[in-house]
Regions:
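Short beta-strand-to-turn element immediately C-terminal to the catalytic PLP-Schiff-base lysine
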Residues: 159, 195-200, 234-237, 317, ...
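ATP-dependent carboxylate activation and anion-phosphoryl transfer catalytic cores
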Residues: 3, 9-12, 150, 278, ...
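ATP-grasp fold ATP-binding core
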Residues: 146-147, 174-195, 216-227
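Short, glycine-/small-residue-rich phosphate/pyrophosphate-handling segment
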Residues: 137-157
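Phosphate-binding site of ATP-dependent enzymes
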Residues: 199-272, 284, 288, 292, ...
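Glycine-rich phosphate-binding loop of ATP-grasp-fold ATP-dependent ligases
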Residues: 19, 153-158, 181-209, 229-231
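Hydrophobic beta-strand scaffold residues
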Residues: 37, 124-125, 153, 182, ...
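ATP-binding N-terminal substructure of ATP-dependent carboxylate-amine bond-forming enzymes
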Residues: 1-131, 135-137, 141, 160-170, ...
């Protein structure tokens, strides 16, 4: 009997379209002999849809016109079964699911939001869990976690938008202490959205205000001179970690832009996702640094308690031959399958391993104790606060 996999993608996020591309790519490679795919698309206005038509990338080029052919649904646990049920007056179950596969990028989705919902319903799902996903989306918190075990990170400072207006001089001085040039980023966005490199103090205000358009939390990092950007994917969970080959990404700008990542040199075909990035595999770095980065990638994956596939991005000071952990991507674009193909792991096998890890993790978690019987409510005597609890010492 085939396992029914709900592939969930889209959502209200600036990385909506990238999520669609990654999901459609993955659905083509999930083994049809073992799994039955149920596409679940969340529109930008947060409406859930299902239907086999949603596996075709062409649908999304004119979705407003074609959406009437898809089914609007809600996700529930009903009589012990996970179901997609139509909305409206006459509700009916259209699909039963065994496991969810979130393929979503950015705020409101990848940041633990969708994972939290799936945890609440109780269905197994692929990838990192709520806390790991949330940390992986927040560039400030992730740096604090990484620095706690002395992983190498670039010097940085951070602040909220309201602090920038209320304590402007203090924050500008903190940025100045980093030393220009710096790079200004929204703290919880990905895909290089809202990012600006600032070479002189006179341009910092404009860059910060641009980042504030996208986020309330801003991070400013010291720019690494003689920069080489490399990425390494990791597959596994808290028990074991396997590192992929390392790619060297080629940017047309001072940092890897949205265009570099998802469009590359292509003229018209924007359906390749991260595959469109200009890259060299394996990265052109010496063997010692290569192995060091693979180990750092696995350490980062483990300390953040990631699961499934992640991509760890690194910055290398090519003059000093020193690598810095830039950030982990808990649901990387294209699921980094192109790195695993170069590691002799075809995409269908990668997806199968991700699903297997999720099922094993769910079984492990199911053996843990998360609730127990108490007599607190039976002794509760009205709404009198702590004094109404008989037999309980304060």
């Amino acid at each position: 009997m085939k396992v029914k996999v709900g592939v969930i993608f889209g959502g209200e996020t600036v990385e909506h379209e990238i999520s669609i591309i990654t999901a459609v790519q993955a659905m083509k490679y999930i083994d049809p002999e073992k799994y039955e795919i149920v596409p679940i698309y969340i529109s930008k206005d947060r409406i859930w849809y299902t239907g086999k038509m949603l596996m075709d990338i062409e649908v999304y080029k004119d979705f407003e016109h074609l959406k009437r052919y898809a089914k609007k649904v809600a996700f529930y646990k009903k009589n012990g079964t996970f179901v997609l049920q139509t909305v409206g007056m006459f509700k009916r179950v259209v699909e039963e699911l065994d496991i969810m596969f979130p393929i979503m990028h950015g705020n409101n989705t990848e940041d633990g939001s969708i994972q939290g919902y799936l945890e609440t319903v109780g269905i197994p799902y692929v990838g990192s869990k709520v806390l790991a996903s949330a940390i992986g989306q927040d560039k400030v918190i992730m740096k604090q976690v990484m620095s706690s075990i002395n992983l190498p990170i670039v010097p940085y400072t951070w602040f909220y938008d309201i602090n920038y207006y209320d304590e402007n001089e203090k924050i500008l001085n903190e940025i100045k202490e980093l030393g220009y040039p710096v790079i200004v980023k929204p703290a919880t966005l990905g895909s290089s959205v809202g990012i600006t490199v600032v070479k002189e103090e006179s341009k910092i205000d404009q860059a910060v205000r641009e980042a504030i358009k996208y986020d309330v939390k801003i991070i400013v990092e010291k720019v690494i001179e003689n920069l080489v950007e490399v990425n390494c994917s990791v597959l596994g969970n808290y028990k074991y970690q396997e590192a992929s080959v390392i790619e060297e990404v080629i940017s047309t700008e001072e940092f890897l832009t949205y265009t570099d990542k998802y469009i590359g040199k292509s003229k018209g075909d924007t359906t390749k996702g991260m595959v469109a990035t200009n890259r060299v595999i394996p990265a052109r770095i010496d063997n010692k640094l290569y192995k060091e980065i693979q180990e750092l990638a696995k350490e980062t994956f483990k300390v953040m308690n990631l699961s499934g596939v992640a991509r760890i991005d690194f910055l290398i000071d090519n003059k000093k031959k020193k690598a810095y952990v830039n950030e982990p991507n808990t649901i990387p674009g294209s699921l980094s399958f192109y790195l695993w193909e170069k590691t002799n792991k075809p995409y269908n096998k990668l997806l199968d391993e991700m699903l297997s890890i999720a099922i094993k993790d769910f079984k492990t978690k199911s053996k843990k104790i998360y609730s127990f019987d108490t007599n607190i409510l039976s002794n509760f005597n009205g709404l009198k606060g702590g004094k109404g609890l008989k037999g309980i010492k304060k």
